[in-house]
């Protein structure tokens, strides 16, 4: 498969999968789940190495189950009721995909996501949301100020960039509101682009996050 070819050709990717497999093994889950679509690059090889089935979850909440022998089938007939998964993700921000799609899709099959395993936690509240949802998060990397302060000392980022990042980490909501107020045409321009840009801008508006002065006229 393409994933196996990438594992063979990229030592960093292979080592990452080794680390995730080691972490996932300790959960003793019944199967592995992953969400469309970046999660699949991590969840599928980990499932294969653990000898477990894999539940592919799509954004429309549809699912496909592939057993440990590589046979794909209708998830409803896969006997997942009462089973527990470890859901493997690339990145956790505020866990919105879990809340909107991954958790409901697994529960619709009578199963539960019992554990979450991610490569990176951006440390923006997603971990607490997952804990409250009953699928506590384990991560290989958590984004903290130390990461960016080290990058600054190494000359990878400027002082201005460091200041911006630290301000965002300290209060992401206030940072974004200040940004929108400083760029009052930003949401209008994003909506005009269409596609995902428009969807994100409209979500920002409908969620009540955008300040009144930053709303499209």
Q: Where do the model's predicted regions map?
A:
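PRPP-associated nucleotide enzymes
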Residues: 1-89, 93-217
């Amino acid at each position: 498969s393409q994933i196996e070819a990438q594992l063979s050709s990229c030592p960093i990717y292979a080592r990452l999968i080794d680390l995730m497999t080691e972490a996932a093994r300790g959960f003793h889950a019944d199967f592995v789940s992953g969400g469309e679509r970046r999660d699949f690059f991590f969840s599928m090889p980990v499932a294969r190495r653990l000898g477990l089935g894999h539940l592919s979850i799509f954004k429309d909440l549809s699912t496909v189950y592939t057993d440990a022998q590589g046979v794909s089938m209708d998830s409803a007939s896969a006997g997942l009721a009462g089973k527990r998964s470890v859901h493997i993700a690339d990145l956790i921000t505020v866990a919105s995909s879990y809340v909107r799609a991954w958790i409901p899709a697994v529960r619709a099959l009578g199963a539960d996501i019992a554990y979450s395993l991610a490569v990176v936690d951006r440390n923006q509240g997603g971990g607490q949301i997952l804990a409250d949802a009953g699928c506590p998060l384990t991560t290989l990397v958590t984004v903290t100020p130390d990461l960016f302060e080290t990058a600054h000392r190494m000359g990878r980022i400027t002082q201005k960039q460091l200041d911006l990042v630290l301000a965002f980490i300290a209060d992401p909501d206030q940072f974004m509101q200040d940004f929108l107020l400083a760029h009052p045409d930003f949401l209008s321009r994003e909506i005009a682009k269409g596609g995902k840009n428009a969807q994100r801008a409209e979500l920002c508006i409908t969620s009540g996050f955008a300040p009144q002065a930053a709303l499209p006229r």
